[in-house]
């Protein structure tokens, strides 16, 4: 015979009872990314109090997307930190994406142990958002404690698995430290690697299986570097306008999510030159509105909810970019 919740709790030790409750009211705050389409797939954004993995091919703007997300978080009064192991952080580039470097905590980390020490310290200090760029560049501390000859001797020993073991322990310690002071969003950036153990070559993130296991969301970003996939625009050189590459299309794939339905995908435009730098939030909003059926398209013509027709995607994006009220209306209807 089953007992009620109240009867079960009444039989417990009073100290233990204080730590228990029911499943009502367990909610998370979400940090929006700069992509409206990705936010919609995530159920609002990335969850605070959780670990998130963003990985993919080089030049897929993983770091830049995270910098734009930091800019959004700073605008909401959040305290953010950047742990840099690639030594690729640029103050000028961060500013161009909307980040306030004066309000950004910055730290370098060579080893996995360094990252854990800094990460736990930042969580205990009450930092809201931490980005690690990237875990691919980090090494176990053992590589810095041995000289070259000793490392050669270690290549054929169990130390060859030190990286995966250290990462596994790192995620345990960081997840244990999280939520003690406040829920911190921990974002891990990883480059893609070839899995040579499979029958066919496949891509996977760094850090071993534990990295994905401890991540509440796994997002893959990828893009093509081919010339025909590049976004081109007119760049003024002297008194002439020359057509050059100004951006590329970035595809995203929500491979796994504990807080929303996974296995969703989409794409957005990313610009590294020109008048608009970074992820094109307006273009992303327009594409999401079309996919959701809020905006109809017939051939090259787009039909707005008020019946107005606009020709071409670029023309429609420019129309929405200039009309802030229309932007807000689309966002509200898509939320």
Language model region names:
Residues 2-104, 117-121:
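The Walker A/P-loop phosphate-binding site
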Residues 159-292:
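Phosphate-binding/switch region of NTP-binding enzymes
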Residues 57, 68, 76-169, 173:
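Conserved inter-motif catalytic segment of the P-loop NTP-binding fold
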Residues 280-310:
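Long, well-ordered amphipathic alpha-helical subdomains in the mid-to-C-terminal portions
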Residues 52-55, 75-77, 180-183, 221, ...:
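Catalytic phosphate/metal-binding cores of nucleic-acid and nucleotide-processing enzymes, i.e., regions
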Residues 38, 53, 94, 133, ...:
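Residue-level signature of catalytic and energy-coupling elements of molecular machines
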Residues 300-335:
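Terminal-proximal interaction/regulatory segments of ATP-powered molecular machines
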């Amino acid at each position: 015979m089953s007992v009620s919740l109240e009867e079960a709790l009444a039989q417990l030790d009073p100290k233990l009872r204080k730590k228990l409750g029911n499943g009502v009211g367990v909610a998370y705050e979400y940090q929006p990314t700069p992509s409206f389409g990705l936010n919609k797939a995530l159920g609002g954004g990335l969850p605070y109090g959780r670990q998130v993995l963003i990985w993919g091919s080089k030049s897929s703007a993983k770091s830049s997307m995270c910098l734009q997300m930091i800019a959004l978080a700073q605008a909401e009064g959040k305290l953010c930190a950047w742990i840099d192991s690639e030594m690729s952080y640029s103050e000028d580039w961060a500013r161009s994406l909307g980040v306030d470097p004066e309000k950004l905590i910055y730290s370098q980390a060579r080893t996995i142990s360094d990252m854990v020490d800094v990460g736990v310290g930042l969580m205990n200090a009450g930092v809201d958002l931490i980005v690690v760029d990237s875990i691919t560049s980090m090494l176990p501390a053992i590589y810095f404690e041995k000289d070259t000859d000793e490392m050669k001797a270690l290549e054929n020993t169990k130390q060859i698995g030190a990286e995966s073991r250290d990462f596994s322990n790192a995620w345990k310690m960081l997840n244990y430290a999280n939520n003690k002071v406040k829920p911190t969003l921990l974002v891990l950036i990883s480059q893609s690697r070839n899995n040579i153990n499979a029958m066919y070559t496949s891509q996977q993130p760094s850090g071993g299986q534990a990295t994905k296991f401890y991540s509440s969301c796994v997002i893959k970003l990828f893009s093509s570097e081919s010339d025909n996939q590049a976004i081109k625009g007119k760049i003024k050189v002297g008194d002439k306008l020359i057509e050059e590459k100004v951006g590329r299309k970035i595809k995203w794939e929500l491979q796994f999510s504990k807080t929303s339905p996974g296995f969703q995908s989409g794409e957005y435009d990313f610009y590294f030159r020109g008048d608009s730098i970074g992820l094109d939030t307006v273009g992303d909003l327009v594409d999401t509105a079309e996919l959701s059926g809020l905006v109809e398209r017939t051939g090259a013509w787009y039909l707005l909810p008020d019946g107005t027709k606009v020709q071409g995607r670029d023309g429609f994006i420019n129309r929405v970019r200039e009309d802030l009220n229309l932007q807000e209306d689309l966002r509200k209807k898509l939320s």
